Amino acid sequence: TPPVLIDAIYQALAQMGLESGNLLEPACGIGNFMGMLPDSMRDCKVYGVELDSISGRIARQLYQNSRIAVTGYEKAEIPDSFFDAAVGNVPFGNIKVVDRRYDKHHWLIHDYFLGKTLDKIRPGGVIAFITSKGTMDKESPAVRKYLAQRADLIGAIRLPNTAFKASAGTDVTSDILFLQKRDRIVDIEPDWVHLDTDENGIRMNSYFVRHPEMVLGEMAMESTQYGMDSVCKPYENADLADLLSEAVSGLHAQIPTYEQDGPEEEDLSIPADPNVRNYSFTSVDGKLYFRIDSRMEPVELPLTTENRVRGMIALRDCT
């Protein structure tokens, strides 16, 4: 992920008040977001998930204070409503992830990461993900309606298709989405669930038609391997960092702060029980713990989530 995009995401979260709490990065790779965590967020506890074992092990070595699960996101045992924010550059592609909890939605991989992560953050928490423009621009509104019922779109930034050229050698139009989780599901269908047509006849998400200042380039139609498709061409001689900074300044939200349990910096973890599978929950003396490698850390969960986790532990332990 280009540093200029990581900086912009952290700039947005900083102005939303994120200074501490739990921060999640699914598909963390070797930990570029972790490495660029600003000083103002050093009190955050950072959690990562990475499928690739080499990248995941590198991230663990580089960022030993972070908690990194080297496994697929679909297999990571991460509690619901636990994180204050989530960041990342999620995988794009026309592939689907097998995850029993979400299979009924038939999501492509980038939409799966958005939908699942909404369950992992607290009400009021914010997701800041780079995703394929397909999430916002696909004809079917189903994914956007699902997200809108569970989160408020703080804003979206359409990136020029050269944003990843230097780092990945690809010309791809992508978006940064900023979503703030609702405290309950609402039957709502805001404008951004649907598409519209701009003044040049290009069909795209209605949010970008109504907010052209959040499109950091010129939208145009171009021939691709899949036929004609819309692309965001970069402005000539424009500095992407400046454009991003200006766009981010227009994002307005406040991430609520939750009281941290226990004295600051106190390590309440205990040595791992070898009979407890790595990256899974267990109960010790009536208290919930989550095993990460050689330690088990206490976790505080909302009551309904805690009851579900305890039920799963009981079911697991009796089989």
Language-model segments: residues:
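A short acidic, Gly/Pro-enriched loop at the edge of an enzyme's catalytic core
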Residues: 77-87
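Conserved SAM-binding strand-loop segment of SAM-dependent methyltransferases
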Residues: 65-73
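Non-catalytic, mostly N-terminal accessory regions of nucleic-acid modification and defense proteins
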Residues: 1-14, 77, 161, 223-319
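Local beta-strand N-terminus motif with an aromatic residue
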Residues: 20, 82-83, 153, 174
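Conserved Class I SAM-dependent methyltransferase catalytic core
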Residues: 51-53, 106-165, 172-179
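Flexible, glycine-/basic-rich loop-and-beta segments that form/coincide
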Residues: 166-262
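Amphipathic alpha-helical repeat scaffolds
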Residues: 87-91, 130
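Class I S-adenosyl-L-methionine
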Residues: 1-62
